[in-house]
Amino acid sequence: MIDIKLPLTDLHRHLDGNIRPETILDLANQHNIQLPANDLESLLPHVQIIENEPSLVSFLQKLDWGVAVLADLDACRRIAIENVEDAINTGLDYAELRFSPYYMAMNHKLPVEGVVEAIIDGIRSARQNNDIDIRLIGILSRTFGEQACTQELTSLLAHQQHITALDLAGDELGFPGHLFQSHFTKARDAGWHITIHAGEAAGAESIWQAIRELGATRIGHGVKAITDPVLMDYLVENRIGIETCLTSNLQTSTVNSLLDHPLKQFLEKDILASINTDDPAVEGIDIRHEYEIAAPAAGLSIAQIRQAQINGLETAFISDTEKQALRMKAANR
């Protein structure tokens, strides 16, 4: 279902949600960190979704063991490198990897800015001699409150030339977007693009808030947009992209089944919705699964899947010149 003559993108891919289970075991052994299991088979149910979770918050708990083993900055650098390797191995031409430096730092009280530096260095190292375009998106983890987000933002701004965009993720219901308006004003002043997790756990009003108050030009998940026809018209008219994550939305019980997912309706409406992974290691999937299994299960036609692939590049946070270079690369395959 993937058109190899088109660039393959993944715009919504959490670096800290894609820590290999084997790496979790290895780092735990290196740093004498107690895990709930000592072998891969027994560990998997603790770090990967086996059955759909009842909520977003319970889904996010599966990420916690991955960051629990980040005992030093070398570990952070390693997972950045492995994320690029995974992106290459799954056939991506372009990926935007997002990460929350505070979340990655907090278990072992690592310097938050040091985590940012380690991720940047790991990405730079892994990209050498590899034909893949990687951009970084910083995340403010709303779950930890405004003060922690201020610390995250300061650390990200210290390396602003290496960061493409800013995101707000975490407990959407408990920490609504209006709490972080000043953070995103600073991000826009720095020249960053804005993408916001919205309309996943909360309703359409959260998406409106992300656009109007935080300046989002892309929305992560955005499932609840389907409940607001005026919002859907606004998304079309203003070319605001929706970063769809099919399997993730099923596993968080945001939708009851893939056939209930609104992606098909978004595409019929000409909303710039794309197909993305979210947390590949936690979900036990890759981008090919989303295109070849999840998208058809969500009722998408081959033409709609192709359009979603086109939308991925169209809404990527890069210049038109860079997009055209990726198109030429794919066309010549």
Curated annotation (Swiss-Prot):
Annotated site (Important for catalytic activity): 221
Keyword terms: Hydrolase, Metal-binding, Nucleotide metabolism, Zinc
Cofactor(s) essential for the protein: Zn(2+)
Domain of life of the native organism: Bacteria
Name of a matching Pfam family: A_deaminase
Record-level GO BP terms: adenosine catabolic process; hypoxanthine salvage; inosine biosynthetic process; nucleotide metabolic process; purine ribonucleoside monophosphate biosynthetic process
Cofactor details (free text): Binds 1 zinc ion per subunit.
Molecular-function GO term, any one: adenosine deaminase activity
Binding of substrate, residues: 14, 16, 170, 279
GO CC annotation: cytosol
Active-site residue numbers: 200 (proton donor)
EC numbers on record: 3.5.4.4
Entry's family note: Belongs to the metallo-dependent hydrolases superfamily. Adenosine and AMP deaminases family. Adenosine deaminase subfamily.
Role summary: Catalyzes the hydrolytic deamination of adenosine and 2-deoxyadenosine.
Protein name in UniProt: Adenosine deaminase
Organism: Photorhabdus laumondii subsp. laumondii (strain DSM 15139 / CIP 105565 / TT01)
Species lineage: Bacteria, Pseudomonadati, Pseudomonadota, Gammaproteobacteria, Enterobacterales
Gene from which this protein is expressed: add
